UniProtKB/Swiss-Prot annotation:
Contains intramolecular disulfide bonds. The chain crosses the membrane at residues 150-170. Interacts with host PYCR2; this interaction results in autophagy activation. Essential for viral fusion with host endosomal membrane and core release. Not required for virus morphogenesis and egress. Induces complete autophagy through the interaction with and down-regulation of host PYCR2. One of its GO terms (cellular component) is membrane. This is Inner membrane protein E199L. One of its GO terms (biological process) is symbiont-mediated activation of host autophagy. It is found in: Virion membrane; Host membrane. The keyword Acetylation does not apply. Induction: Expressed in the late phase of the viral replicative cycle. It is a single-pass membrane protein. Keywords: Activation of host autophagy by virus, Disulfide bond, Glycoprotein, Host membrane, Host-virus interaction, Late protein, Membrane, Transmembrane, Transmembrane helix, Virion. It comes from African swine fever virus (isolate Tick/Malawi/Lil 20-1/1983) (ASFV).
Length: 199
């Protein structure tokens, strides 16, 4: 069964992945490498090579970049564009045939899903700006719209930015208090940040 998408835009928030696509036995004949990758994913043994074999629309390579598979159950995690799909998006989280990348596996294995998430069938709306396009997502859970706001501490990159901002604020406060001697002053932020790179 073909699962032709209406859109092939990277990171689209697609409503569902109700098209099951070919059965696993059919997939084994047509796409043996992808079939093997999905089986390894079911056993939490997927590799970076498997991630490449499965791919995504955003990657523009692999099984899930192909129109006939992009909407299939196998691609519900990699093509959903949803925040924490492996934790809270039912077509990904609740489907053993949905390929989960090594990153998804690590989040699940290390129990890094944010607390209080509800398993939802689809995404009603999402928004944000710049590189933080996943600032919020409205999940449709049993006809009730739940807005999920990102906890900054769940994003290591955002946490690092927050720490740097705090250091800059502390520096500004201390330097504006006006030390009497040059040796009392903190080094400039550029020197602080260059030292961070040495860790």
């Amino acid at each position: 069964m073909s699962c032709m998408p209406i859109s092939t835009k990277c990171n689209d928030i697609w409503v569902d992945f109700s098209c099951t696509g070919p059965s696993l036995s059919e997939l084994q004949k047509k796409e043996p490498k992808a079939w093997a990758a999905i089986l390894r994913s079911q056993r939490s043994q997927q590799t970076a090579e498997d991630d490449t074999i499965i791919g995504s629309i955003c990657d523009k390579q692999g099984l899930c970049s192909k129109n006939e598979y992009a909407y299939s159950q196998y691609c519900a995690c990699v093509n959903s564009g949803t925040l924490w799909a492996e934790c809270a998006f039912a077509p990904c989280n609740g489907n053993k045939n949905a390929y989960k990348t090594t990153e998804h596996r690590n989040i699940l294995t290390n129990k890094q899903c944010p607390s209080g998430l509800t398993i939802c069938q689809n995404i009603a709306e999402y928004g944000g700006t710049g590189n933080i396009s996943d600032l919020y997502q409205n999940f449709n859970c049993n006809s009730v719209i739940n807005t999920f706001l990102i906890n900054v501490m769940n994003h290591p990159f955002l946490t690092l930015i927050l720490i740097i901002l705090i250091l800059v604020i502390i520096y500004r406060l201390m330097s504006s208090s006006g030390g009497k001697h040059n040796e009392d002053k903190l080094p400039p932020p550029s020197l602080i940040f260059s030292n961070l790179n040495n860790f």
